[in-house]
UniProtKB/Swiss-Prot annotation:
InterPro entries: Isoprenoid_synthase_dom_sf. It comes from Bradyrhizobium diazoefficiens (strain JCM 10833 / BCRC 13528 / IAM 13628 / NBRC 14792 / USDA 110). Gene3D superfamilies: Farnesyl Diphosphate Synthase. This is Uncharacterized protein blr2150. The lineage of its organism: Bacteria, Pseudomonadati, Pseudomonadota, Alphaproteobacteria, Hyphomicrobiales. It comes from the Bacteria. It holds the Pfam family Terpene_syn_C_2. Coiled coil: none annotated. SUPFAM superfamilies: Terpenoid synthases.
Length: 300
């Protein structure tokens, strides 16, 4: 697999064409991407005979890292105001439609979308990735707006939106597009769609529980812990959300035990379910619990 420093530099070279792109976006994307790819590498070796896609292919790996970095950057564009609302609207349209951005300063968007379109093992995955990007952008926008609105969401509404704002569907779809994981076919199965919803809910709750102290210190309100405490100050919120997390995890395990999904979906889902311990808690920047910053909404 490509060396970490070299991978970070390649992501940074691409990201320099995006206004507001930071070193942290590249570093965390490579770190998270490495974690995922290492966990599914044996399975990708097994599928390569069918797909012809080498799990060690540097072009595929760097493209995956760049898509993860894009998700981090988009998250911070919403939470930290890295770009103006007009610029963000133009970027969202470009990424969601797969066309060049109408405004200067965001050439990397078109470059990445063109790369993904060219590399797509299954064109259905590229079309789905555009749709997932639109859903992610809309969820980020809605969450940011609700955090400052007079009338706040219920917990159910928050979690429903959070399933899209955690962007796990985007991550999975990008992996499928690059390594031929047949996600477009699997999405037709109700059990697979249920797995997507459950692992995304798990990811949202893990993210919020890990980042709640930092979000509170930074004045962030788009977090399940903070939302529930505002509504119910006497509620044992952390215990409640940990129970919710455990329940979603049990339901996920039941579905995974009942259904047989082709490799590498088992190890991939397991890797994402363990991300709080294996990724968030080992972060030295974005997810450090002692660092005060906004924008802890990003995906793994």
């Amino acid at each position: 697999m490509i060396q970490t420093e070299r991978a970070v530099q390649q992501v940074l070279e691409w990201g320099r064409s995006l206004t507001g792109f930071a070193d942290e976006h590249a570093v965390e994307a490579v770190r998270g991407g490495q974690y995922i790819l290492q966990r599914i590498h044996p399975s990708l070796r097994g599928t390569s005979a069918r797909t012809g896609r080498d799990p060690q292919d540097e072009t595929l790996i760097v493209t995956f890292y760049r898509e993860l970095a894009l998700l981090f950057w988009l998250d911070d564009c919403n939470d930290l105001g890295l770009i103006s609302p007009e610029q963000l609207a133009a970027v969202e349209q470009a990424l969601g439609q797969g066309v060049p951005c109408a405004l200067p300063g965001f050439e990397g968007c078109a470059v990445l979308r063109a790369s993904l379109a060219t590399l797509a093992y299954d064109r259905r995955d590229y079309a789905q990735l555009l749709d997932d990007t639109r859903c992610y952008s809309a969820a980020l926008r809605a969450g940011h707006a609700q955090a400052v609105a007079a009338e706040r969401w219920s917990y159910a509404e928050y979690l429903h939106n959070g399933i899209d704002s955690i962007a796990y569907a985007n991550v999975f779809c990008c992996l499928s597009l690059l390594w031929g994981l047949d996600m477009a076919t699997l999405r037709a199965r109700p059990a697979f769609r249920q797995v997507l919803r459950l692992i995304s809910a798990i990811g949202r709750l893990q993210n919020d529980l890990h980042g709640c102290d930092k979000d509170r210190s930074a004045g962030e309100a788009d977090n399940a812990v903070i939302l529930l405490l505002q509504r119910y100050p006497a509620m044992p919120v952390v215990e409640f959300l940990n129970d919710e997390l455990a329940g979603h995890t049990r339901m996920l395990h039941r579905v995974m035990a009942e259904e047989r999904f082709p490799a590498p979906w088992g190890p991939l889902i397991e890797a994402m379910a363990a991300i709080r311990v294996q990724y968030y808690r080992t972060s030295t920047s974005r997810y450090r619990s002692d660092a005060v910053r906004g924008g802890q909404r990003a995906p793994a």
